[in-house]
């Protein structure tokens, strides 16, 4: 049976990648269908109830700068906000928020249902309609054919999902949801480089059975930060604390005694899990010299007693889970509401994707999220946004959006994935970016919002707000340059705790390491200073890091001369005999789109790149 209504874009999956993909496509004016196995789980936080963190917060800011929904949603559902690395440089400072997962999901659902050009449909997708090498649509569980020009697959952990608790395992996309086995089989019939990964989650606890008086209180920041550039702290719901406790020697002994039933250590699970989010049993074995590991006790929301003990992800048997949980300070009488588990699932080699996240071998099919080997809500959402934008661009015959490594963390992530691939769940960190001083949280809108305007992703009101903000920044910088402090100014010397030996502008004073905008504002200048903390930080960072940023821009310009040189997919690398056999094989396998991508393939040396450039010049001449 074929449905008569035709959509231009179909998005499969309603998680963090799927929702951003569908909203982006629809915002660009393209008729879009989001199809999910269960509409009640749209925007579900399957694991930890939090958004942001080091590197991840940067992605959320970039998604927001491009008109995405994640930042706005967490501003309306976040029950604790903190700035991480606050004492470090601005490049690595990051926002993190604890979420009320019920509120979060509700806000996502509201955004989806009220977006023009977007329809929702509840069904599992069992098959793809592919003719030749071109996607034509999808087939649902009930045999309904839905036709589309582009399809974006955001399957999360559902493809061939198997859940493990001790020696028991069963099929599932996550606890309580069926897997997508039929779709997994369909994709496996194509040569797309399928492999398996695993992730895990801790047991959820009944907060009424915990003794918080035995734990350390962890409060949020004051003043409260916001994620969205147009967000206001008044949008935040009631704020509540988190808590910290620790495992102990007895906890670790109980875990060791239960390893005989661990699917990880008995070989039932062979897939690789997240390096930076290991299970508690993995931590106990790998760091056997330690008698304690930190646990963040995180509330799941304002209207539930459920608690998420961050740091004890596990797939041990239920009995061992309960025993080791009850050995932890404050958890002595804890009751488990949901057991922890590990889940294995299919992912596909992201080196088989174009920079747009379109599958190289199947035109019009895009992959986003965990299907590409990433882990985390933020990484998934960023890929969904990119895939949604580029699917719409292809429909509208616009140039694709291809963010570069020096423009965004989204660009860093996609470039890493499509050039290097991954054999473990990929997580974003600031350390992955070469130019992280340019890729700060505070300037994500400056970097990306003009592109969002060009693509039709933001409203005119949002664009006006952006222009007002940066006009104010430029006006204030101009004022600081034209406001002078005289030599030996007594008030300035006292406030700055240093002698001003000759005349300085406020602009020059702000370059000093121990002088920030708020200190400067105490000096009598005869004119008002800004009171908006966001604008203060932007101005501070632009002035303080101007010299370093200038040097990085010079480096980038040199690099870009060859970075964007296009490599035709028709090049026969085996014919370039000056290249080593290894390099020829790798270039043939990956078919990089640019010299920059080729240079980041493992084993491709700078000498090989020089040979390629000579080859291209010879070919042109």
Swiss-Prot record:
UniProt keyword Membrane present: no
Alphabetical list of PROSITE patterns matching this protein: GIDA_1, GIDA_2
Biological processes per GO annotation: tRNA methylation; tRNA wobble uridine modification
Required cofactor(s): FAD
GO cellular component: cytosol
InterPro entries: FAD/NAD-bd_sf, GIDA_C_N, MnmG, MnmG-rel, MnmG-rel_CS, MnmG_C, MnmG_C_subdom, MnmG_C_subdom_sf
Listed Gene3D superfamilies: FAD/NAD(P)-binding domain, GidA associated domain, C-terminal subdomain, tRNA uridine 5-carboxymethylaminomethyl modification enzyme MnmG/GidA
A Pfam family reported for this protein in Swiss-Prot or TrEMBL: SAM_GIDA_C
SMART domains named among the record's database cross-references: GIDA_assoc_3 (SM01228)
Primary subcellular site in the record, as a coarse category: cytoplasm
Any one GO molecular-function label of the UniProt entry: flavin adenine dinucleotide binding
Keywords per UniProt: Cytoplasm, FAD, Flavoprotein, NAD, tRNA processing
Residues annotated for FAD binding in this entry: 13-18, 125, 180, 370
Family: Belongs to the MnmG family.
Biological role stated in the UniProt entry: NAD-binding protein involved in the addition of a carboxymethylaminomethyl (cmnm) group at the wobble position (U34) of certain tRNAs, forming tRNA-cmnm(5)s(2)U34.
Subunit relationships: Homodimer. Heterotetramer of two MnmE and two MnmG subunits.
Record-given protein name: tRNA uridine 5-carboxymethylaminomethyl modification enzyme MnmG
Phylogenetic classification of the source organism: Bacteria, Pseudomonadati, Pseudomonadota, Gammaproteobacteria, Candidatus Pseudothioglobaceae
């Amino acid at each position: 049976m074929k449905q008569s209504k035709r959509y231009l874009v179909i998005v499969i999956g309603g998680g963090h990648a799927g929702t951003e993909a569908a909203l982006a496509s629809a915002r660009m004016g393209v008729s879009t269908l989001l199809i999910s196995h269960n509409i009640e789980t749209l925007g579900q936080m399957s694991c930890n109830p939090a958004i942001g963190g080091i590197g991840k917060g940067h992605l959320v800011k970039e998604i927001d700068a491009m008109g995405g929904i994640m930042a706005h949603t967490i501003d309306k559902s976040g029950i604790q906000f903190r700035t991480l690395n606050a004492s470090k440089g601005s490049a690595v400072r990051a926002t993190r928020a604890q979420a009320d997962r019920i509120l979060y999901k509700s806000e996502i659902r509201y955004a989806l249902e009220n977006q023009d050009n977007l329809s929702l449909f509840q069904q599992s997708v069992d098959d793809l309609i592919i003719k030749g090498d071109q996607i034509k649509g999808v087939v649902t569980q009930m045999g309904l054919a839905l036709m589309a020009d582009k399809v974006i697959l955001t399957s999360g952990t559902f493809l061939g999902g198997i859940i493990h608790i001790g020696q028991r395992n069963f099929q599932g996309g996550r606890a309580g949801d069926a897997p997508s086995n039929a779709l997994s089989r369909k994709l496996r019939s194509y040569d797309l480089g399928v492999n398996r990964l695993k992730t895990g989650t801790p047991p959820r606890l009944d907060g009424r059975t915990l003794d918080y008086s035995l734990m350390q209180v962890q409060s949020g920041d004051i003043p409260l930060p916001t994620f969205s550039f147009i967000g206001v702290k008044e949008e935040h719901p009631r704020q509540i604390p988190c808590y910290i406790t620790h495992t102990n020697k007895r906890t670790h002994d109980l875990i060791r005694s239960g390893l005989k039933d661990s699917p990880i250590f008995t070989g039932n699970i062979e897939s690789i899990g997240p390096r930076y989010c290991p299970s508690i049993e993995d931590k106990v074995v790998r760091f056997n010299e330690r008698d304690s590991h930190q646990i963040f006790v995180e509330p799941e929301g304002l209207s539930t007693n459920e608690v998420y003990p961050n740091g004890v992800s596990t797939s041990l048997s239920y009995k061992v889970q309960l025993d080791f949980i009850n050995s932890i300070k404050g958890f002595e009488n804890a009751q488990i509401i949901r057991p922890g588990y590990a889940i294995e699932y299919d992912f596909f080699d992201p080196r088989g994707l174009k920079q747009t996240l379109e599958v190289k071998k199947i035109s019009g099919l895009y992959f986003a999220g965990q299907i590409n080997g990433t882990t985390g809500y933020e990484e998934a959402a960023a890929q969904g946004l990119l895939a949604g934008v580029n699917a719409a661009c292809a429909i509208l015959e616009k140039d694709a959006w291809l963010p570069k490594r020096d423009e965004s963390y989204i660009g860093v992530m996609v470039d890493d994935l499509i050039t290097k691939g991954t054999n473990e769940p990929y997580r974003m960190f600031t350390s992955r970016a070469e130019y992280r001083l340019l890729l700060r949280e505070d300037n994500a809108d400056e970097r990306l919002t003009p592109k969002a305007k060009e693509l039709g992703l933001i409203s005119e009101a949002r664009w006006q707000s952006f222009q007002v903000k940066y006009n104010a920044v430029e006006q204030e910088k101009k004022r600081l340059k034209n406001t002078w402090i005289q030599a030996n100014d007594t008030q300035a010397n006292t406030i700055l705790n240093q002698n001003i030996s000759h005349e300085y502008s406020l602009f020059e004073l702000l370059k000093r390491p121990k002088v920030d905008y708020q200190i400067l504002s105490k000096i009598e200048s005869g004119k008002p200073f800004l009171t908006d903390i966001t604008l203060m930080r932007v101005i501070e960072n632009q002035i303080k890091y101007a010299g370093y940023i200038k040097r990085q821009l010079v480096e980038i310009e040199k690099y870009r001369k060859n970075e964007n040189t296009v490599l035709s997919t028709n090049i026969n690398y085996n014919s370039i005999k000056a290249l080593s056999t290894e390099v020829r094989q790798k270039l043939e396998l990956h078919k990089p789109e640019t010299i920059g991508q080729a240079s980041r393939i493992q084993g491709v040396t700078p000498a090989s790149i020089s040979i390629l450039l000579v080859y291209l010049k010879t070919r042109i001449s």
